[in-house]
Curated annotation (Swiss-Prot):
Keyword presence, Oxidoreductase: yes
Top EC class for this record: oxidoreductase
Annotated protein name in UniProt: Pyruvate dehydrogenase E1 component
GO molecular function: pyruvate dehydrogenase (acetyl-transferring) activity
Quaternary structure note: Homodimer.
EC number(s) from the headed UniProt entry: 1.2.4.1
Signal peptide: none
Length: 45
């Protein structure tokens, strides 16, 4: 299921890939939103 947290995470990952934000921001979002980093990203399914 794609919810708002996965959408935000995908956007943050794209920004980090471009170098616009630090990777730690992505890690902080994962912790804050309680996202299981081992779970497959539903946007990629």
């Amino acid at each position: 299921e794609v919810d708002r947290y996965w959408v935000v995470l995908a956007a943050l990952e794209a920004l980090a890939d471009r170098g616009d934000i630090e990777a730690k921001v992505v890690a902080e979002a994962i912790a804050k939103f309680g996202i299981d980093p081992d779970k497959r990203n539903p946007l990629d399914c």
